[in-house]
Amino acid sequence: MEYEAVADLAPDRRVALFERDAGVDAVRSDVAEILDRVESEGDVALRALASEFDDVEVGNLDVTDEMERAADAVPDDVYDAIEDAAANIRAFHEAQLPDDWRESFAAGRELGRRFRPVRRVGVYAPGGTAAYPSSVLMGVIPAVVAGVEQVAVATPPAETINPVTLAAAHAAGADRVYQVGGAQAIGAFAYGTETVDTVQTVVGPGNKWVTAAKAEVRGDVEIDFLAGPSELLVVADETAEPAFVAADLLAQAEHDPNASVVAVTDDEATAAAITDAVAARLDDRERADTIRAALDNEASGVFVARSMSEAVMFAEEYAAEHLSIQASDDEALLDRIDSAGSVFLGGYAPVAAGDYAAGTNHVLPTNGTARVTGGLSVDTFLRSTTVQRLDREGLAALRETVTTLADAEGLEGHAASVDARFEDE
């Protein structure tokens, strides 16, 4: 891994860095077929697809009853860690809850907003034999905090669903758990089957099949966003500890061979030290092949900027899922960067802390969509409704404005609906 100069980036290199996509086009037609099967065949399709894709003959699709047993079965230290993480995530998301409000804006005119949760949510949690309890916690807890009536989890089927995943669903407060994976899980949530209830909102990370399915069903249900492989961008200055930066890059790279990991600094010696630290630690990692592939990704690299202003511009254009700022003036730099899914300030805020237990959510926008949206939060599950109360005095004050604008738009009935309330004058 060699460092590069930002100023020398060729146009095609810039495209690879700044115009990333989720890579779903290649599977769209296959995903559409899967969704059609789920919509038309229901549980029959879910069982057939489990056999086809997961090599599992599924009996009960609903494994809700296994949650409590799993919580008792996992090692105490694991369940304690799940509960500790859940408590932190819950506290942070409870702090996000908005209050209903109503205020007087003029005599006789009150305006306000109220917030109500959607009723049913589906959370996709990757992994069948593998365990991703953190994804369960991150998806379920904000929905529960928002007041959603029914929160269901779907996770890929296995001969035995990993008890850690089920234990996390129990700790998070999930109401249902289904052993359904991939695009078919998204279809089941969107269209319903004999076993799986339809939901109003589908959230959670997944592979390109899951992402393509979410794109297809958007409109039938609400979704969080279309997420791609994991991303990290580190902004570092000469005070950054290269070993810390390298450790963070390697940690994110182990997610996926398509993950994108980037460091940008205004100090060439720091860039060289980071690349050396990455190389020194790479071969010792259990997932070295995956990490190596991610480091070779066209959207990955270590870059030297001519100034910290250029580094900031690079970070803003990249709009990373995870942004780490390891620099002496990290708060000042943060004020200059608007586009990032989640920000980690200082050398002792590794992304792994946010991934698991700091309390913030790790379901975040990727592929530059942090320019236009934020990560999963309580707001994802809330609907806001505006409220207005006018008395006669309040409407009288607005009467001329409303009727004039209604007449200008040729909507005579709108004007008449106001005038009708003053016919006794």
From Swiss-Prot:
Residues at which Zn(2+) binds: 252, 255, 355, 414
User: Which positions are annotated as binding substrate?
Assistant: 230, 252, 255, 322, 355, 409, 414
**Record-level Gene Ontology MF annotations:** histidinol dehydrogenase activity; NAD binding; zinc ion binding
GO cellular component entries: cytoplasm
User: What are the alphabetically sorted keywords of the record?
Assistant: Amino-acid biosynthesis, Histidine biosynthesis, Metal-binding, NAD, Oxidoreductase, Zinc
Q: Where is the active site?
A: 321 (proton acceptor), 322 (proton acceptor)
Quote the cofactor binding remark: Binds 1 zinc ion per subunit.
**SUPFAM superfamilies from the xrefs?**
ALDH-like
- Entry cofactors: Zn(2+)
Q: Name one Pfam family in it.
A: Histidinol_dh
Q: Where does NAD(+) bind?
A: 124, 184, 207
Record's keyword annotation contains Transmembrane helix:
no
NCBIfam families for this protein: hisD
> What family name appears in the similarity comment?
Belongs to the histidinol dehydrogenase family.
Under which name does UniProt file this protein? Histidinol dehydrogenase
This protein's species is Halobacterium salinarum (strain ATCC 700922 / JCM 11081 / NRC-1) (Halobacterium halobium)
Q: What is the lineage of its organism?
A: Archaea, Methanobacteriati, Methanobacteriota, Stenosarchaea group, Halobacteria
Name of the gene encoding the protein in the UniProt record: hisD
